[in-house]
Amino acid sequence: MQPVFGDTGMNRAQSCYSRLLIDNHITDLKDSYMRKFSPEEYIRMVRLSGVESAMVYACDHNGNCYYPTQAGHIHANLDGRDIFGETVAGLRKAGIVPVAYYTVNYHNDCARRLPHTRVIDNVGMDHDGRYHFTCPNQPEALAFYETQLAEILQYDVDGIFIDMTFWPTICCCSACREKYGNPFQEVIDWDSPDWVGFQRFRERSLAEFAQKLTDFVRRMKPGIAVTHQFSPVLHGWYLGQSDGIAAASDYASGDFYGGRTQQRFAVKTFAAYTRIPPFEFMTSRCVSLNDHTSAKSDEELFLSALTTLANGGAYLFIDAINPDGTLEETFYRRFHDLNRRLEPFRNAVRNLNGHSAASVGVYFSMASCVNRAINGIELKKFNGGRANNMSVRKNAVLDEMLGMTEVLNRLHTQWKVITSSTADFSGLETLIVCNAAYLAPEETGRLREFVRNGGTLIATGATSLYDTEGCGGKNFALADVFGVDYTGKRSDSVTYTGTELIYAEGNVPLTRPVPETEVRGTLTFPDFPVNDPERYASIHSNPPGEKTDFPALT
């Protein structure tokens, strides 16, 4: 059941299932930029669209503020106008719930204004192209953000979305080193408690930072909704998020650009993590966030919104303002028709306040979404790729979960996400745990109890080999449930399973069955080391060789 908050910003914001964000990361490098912005025209477009709530930019990634800040940079072409305040007031008058947008960490003005607070990555860089970063462990950066938040919260908004609460890279700045208190690990090694401990430090630091911002917002403006960017939940270890970000948010919210398969998994993940329904699923109305003009079809937008609603969430589409400050009316007319078409579905979801009755659960362990493929790489030589949440970041554990859920979707099997903090498994008949190598004792205890009570557990890979701090590694905590013991060795990066010789990539743990365990399939290895340049069976591939007696399926 959805909580009742009375006549508060939280209640007003969370009663909306159709939402809009107009991206506004426009610089002031040309005199014409933002000169044609009109709050009246902006509000006309929002009203035309038919949405119930609109998120308005108070400050963008450039650090340009759209109100008269005393603590940062005002967009130079506004000539002192408070377009944020005018827009928020106009939306309120029009009966549209206003929510503020603010960015942290990715804040060029703060990084330039306070250069000693910048992120310094593992190769010594303090920015990535156009983006300049500050470190969440730098107290002066936090103080700067709180000062701007205090200004923004003076306005009549019902909620605030704090963007970019994730690590843009592996920060090695002085504040991180001082807070960590130990030398940083020089080599990436997911089998080492030292490296895993460093990763947990990154996650805890970020969660603490997010919670401090949330607590500040609640002190300044009690009763409004506050949430953080949580899309990195599907990006793995590198961006450094944990379920602490969800705990610091009133509802799960974030933007995704990975298409249908990613959305189907993301909405169920958000439904599992959100503290207060509905969660908020954002995506661009253009083909991608990097594309300013090419629009998705009406059917694609409709099905995306419907997928979100079907899982109990609120849909939010992202448009992008033109550099001169104008908007394209054609889209808002299309959006109007789309919202009318979606109205009966919105009303049904709002009135029913339903929850998933699925009997199949897919276990999501954020702590386990690591990348063993980079084991052995020196930290100073590691390249983590572009530091943002706009692409689909490859991660073997996440890829396995996405593949598993796509199979369930094609079988028309209802499923839901179970998280590390889910205590109640009632209603579940089957639980699928995909290579969740890092599980806390309380998690393995719940899984063991689930099996004891008659549930079917499907676990893959290195599930339960370590605790969340990386300790263990000698045997599975759930070895008694699996019926196998770890030999201490792993396979090469290609294996084949059973008589069907099902191909798989990754270094899987090699095990031995205990007495009375029924082995239903064994592993087959290639005849030669994978991708050996001189010794191989086939020049293009690594075909199966001799069958082994290592269990693959028990």
Q: Model regions: which residues?
A:
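Active-site-adjacent "subsite" loops/lids of carbohydrate-active enzymes
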Residues: A100-Y155, C172, F184-Q199, Q211, ...
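Short, solvent-exposed turn/loop segments enriched in Gly/Ser/Thr/Pro and often Arg
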Residues: D23-H25, M55-G63, Y102-D109, F161-C171, ...
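Aromatic-lined carbohydrate-binding/catalytic grooves of carbohydrate-active enzymes
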Residues: Y42-I43, R47-I83, Y106-R130, P136, ...
